[in-house]
Regions:
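DNA breakage-rejoining catalytic core of tyrosine-based enzymes
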Residues: 13-16, 27-47, 95-117, 133-136
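C-terminal catalytic core of tyrosine-transesterase DNA break-rejoin enzymes
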Residues: 10, 53, 59, 63, ...
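Active-site/catalytic core of tyrosine-dependent DNA strand-transfer enzymes
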Residues: 39, 91, 116-161
């Protein structure tokens, strides 16, 4: 809805976007995030044929954490195959019968995502399979509703718990947190405007961080005590 009014403000000289005056509903510190583990995602993706459109779409959603609107706006020109980088610089949505491609919602949403080698190869194979694809053509010329429908059907086939398309983004973050990736790096990868958004949304997924701090202090204190003892002996 915000994107729709933003478009209206730009194109039809709407004086103000009313959505920007409405506070976000609910608690931003959401402890009820719904996401898949890596095993659950693998169970889901295995229901699709590798190399197909939807297979690659879900691969990119899970392994980059991009938003669905950002994914649907990606063109061949946004992919740097030499540097393994994906440029996020626009977003797509559909209103009525019109396809709208506009700038991302915040300055921080403009970003370059480093992608793993295997994902780069999957994208390259898909692009090469569409010979003559123009650099400015959308990789995935479908609408969000089609992605949602496909995901719902494959969830039933896979027998995994039901989540939304946007929850795949949460799944990406949960995976990164499990691997020990720092919040600041996650913020930049997701395109969050403020680190507080990242921490308020995902901070509770760091259950072992306080224990790590205590262990770190124990180690430092032990080193300090050892050092003091050695100094006394030398004196």
């Amino acid at each position: 809805l915000t994107s729709l009014f933003t478009h209206a403000a730009k194109i039809y000289d709407l004086p103000v976007n009313p959505c920007k005056k409405v506070k976000r509903m609910g608690n931003s510190d959401s402890r009820s995030l719904n996401f898949w583990t890596l095993d659950e995602y693998k169970q889901f993706i295995q229901t699709m044929e590798p190399g197909t459109r939807y297979y690659l779409m879900f691969e990119m959603l899970f392994w980059t954490g991009c938003r669905i609107g950002e994914l649907l706006a990606i063109t061949k020109a946004d992919i740097n195959f030499e540097k393994n980088q994906l440029s996020i610089n626009k977003t797509y949505y559909r209103t009525g019968m019109q396809d709208i491609i506009t700038e991302p919602k915040t300055k921080q949403s403009f970003r370059t995502i480093e992608i793993p080698e295997f994902l780069k190869e999957e994208i390259k194979e898909f692009v090469d399979g569409h010979y003559g694809m123009p650099d400015t053509e959308r990789l995935f010329p479908v609408v969000q509703e089609a992605v949602q429908h496909k995901m719902k059907r494959q969830i039933e086939l896979a027998g995994v718990k039901k989540i939304r398309v946007h929850d795949i983004r949460h799944s990406h973050v949960a995976y990164l947190i499990e691997k020990g990736v720092e919040p600041l790096l996650i913020r930049d990868r997701l395109g969050h405007k403020d680190i507080r958004i990242t921490l308020n949304t995902y901070g509770h997924l760091y259950p072992n961080q306080q224990r790590k701090i205590a262990n770190l202090l124990d180690n430092e204190n032990g080193n300090a005590v050892t050092g003091l003892g050695e100094e006394r002996d030398e004196c």
